[in-house]
């Protein structure tokens, strides 16, 4: 589903990852992170896809909201598990969306 974002400007966090073979607890944690993100101030929506690489784009009102999400206690735990057992590599990019269009 394509996220229904407001009129720009707003911010996008692009999380690109490659997975390890380990799956233990991943699906549950992924579901929990979506639920938790949706409760955070400034969260606007997200889009996600996975094949050989995974790409999740989450949308946020401002940079402070992104910082607060990054430092959320449960999210910090998920980040730790991701580094230790679920991801063989990842990259995070933060962008300001100045224009969007579509139908």
What are these regions (language model features)?
Residues 59:
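Sensory beta-strand/linker motifs that couple input domains to effectors
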């Amino acid at each position: 589903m394509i996220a229904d974002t407001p009129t720009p400007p707003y911010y996008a966090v692009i999380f690109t990852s490659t997975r390890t073979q380990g799956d233990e607890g991943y699906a549950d944690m992924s579901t929990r992170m979506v639920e938790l993100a949706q409760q955070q101030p400034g969260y606007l929506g997200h889009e996600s896809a996975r094949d050989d690489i995974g790409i999740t784009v989450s949308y946020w009102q401002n940079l402070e909201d992104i910082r607060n999400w990054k430092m959320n206690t449960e999210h910090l735990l998920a980040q730790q598990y991701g580094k230790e057992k679920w991801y063989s590599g990842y990259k995070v990019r933060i962008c300001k969306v100045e224009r969007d269009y579509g139908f």
